[in-house]
């Protein structure tokens, strides 16, 4: 299972520029660690999925960021599942990880087609099978 996530910096850390205070530096590092860990995404246990650490690109937060630019996080992860046919759902923990996040749009592409599910706070469950 391949996963891609794009999250605006404002929703993840409350700002979209290079950190200007020690607190912002810590907040940015924490957000990167949470996204890297992959703990915000839990596949159905029956599928037996594992993933190496995700790849996280934090764009717009370094010293070279354009003033007034847009900062965001792009995350990719590849899960390997022992029983992919049993991958019926996901639990998305982004609301717990990022308290200002209000909505997550999940685009799902499977062998049986494509669909979209919208999660509004506090929803966390995504159904993958029809």
Question: Predicted regions: what is each one?
Answer:
Residues 1-130:
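N-terminal soluble domains immediately following signal/targeting peptides that reside
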């Amino acid at each position: 299972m391949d996963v891609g996530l794009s999250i605006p910096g404002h929703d993840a850390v409350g700002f979209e520029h290079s950190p200007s205070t020690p607190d912002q530096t810590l907040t940015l590092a924490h957000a990167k660690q949470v996204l890297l860990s992959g703990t915000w995404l839990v596949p159905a246990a029956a599928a037996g999925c594992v993933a190496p650490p995700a790849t996280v690109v934090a764009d717009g937060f370094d010293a070279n960021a354009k003033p007034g630019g847009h900062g965001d996080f792009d995350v990719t992860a590849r899960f390997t599942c022992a029983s992919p046919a049993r991958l019926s759902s996901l639990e998305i923990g982004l609301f717990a990880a990022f308290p200002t996040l209000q909505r997550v749009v999940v685009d799902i592409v499977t062998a049986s087609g494509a669909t979209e599910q919208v999660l509004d706070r506090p929803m966390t469950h995504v159904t993958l099978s029809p």
